[in-house]
């Protein structure tokens, strides 16, 4: 496990990198970025988007929301195939020679429960995020796992 602590200047830089990678997303509704750092070195990055080789269109117009509820007008609905930023970062990490053991995740938005489970299972020991997610189950899970969770003030 990594014992090297990040200083405030580097925390800001890595969080800024997460936002820069979020800008690479082709999603229209929400752009999310994730940077995995170990020993103050980036070991993987990810942003939300379609799987490799698929069309880069992350949403579709629909009269139904993500939960199947009918709506009076069409709205943009995220396609179920879209990978979250954390999923992309972790799958890239899995294909590398690096390990997530002892790493820190910098994410533009708090992780959902599924991504929180992936972060924990990958050995991530600390998570920084700026924006809340629509539910707090992911943060609750990370806290239960004794993962350091820090909401970063957006300056």
Region locations from a protein language model:
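Zinc-dependent deaminase catalytic domain
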Residues: 1-155
């Amino acid at each position: 496990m990594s014992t090297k602590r990040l200083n405030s200047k580097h925390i800001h830089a890595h969080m800024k990198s997460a936002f820069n990678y979020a800008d690479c997303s082709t999603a229209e509704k929400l752009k999310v970025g994730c940077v995995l750092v170990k020993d103050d070195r980036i070991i993987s990055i990810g942003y939300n988007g379609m799987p490799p080789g698929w069309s880069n269109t992350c949403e579709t117009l629909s009269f139904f929301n993500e939960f199947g509820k009918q709506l009076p007008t069409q709205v943009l609905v995220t396609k179920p195939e879209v990978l979250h930023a954390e999923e992309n970062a972790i799958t890239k990490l899995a294909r590398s020679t690096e390990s997530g053991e002892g790493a820190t995740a910098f994410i533009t938005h708090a992780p959902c429960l599924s991504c929180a489970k992936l972060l924990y299972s990958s050995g991530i020991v600390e998570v920084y995020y700026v924006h809340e997610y629509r539910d707090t189950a992911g943060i609750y899970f990370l806290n239960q796992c004794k993962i350091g969770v820090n909401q970063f003030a957006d300056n």
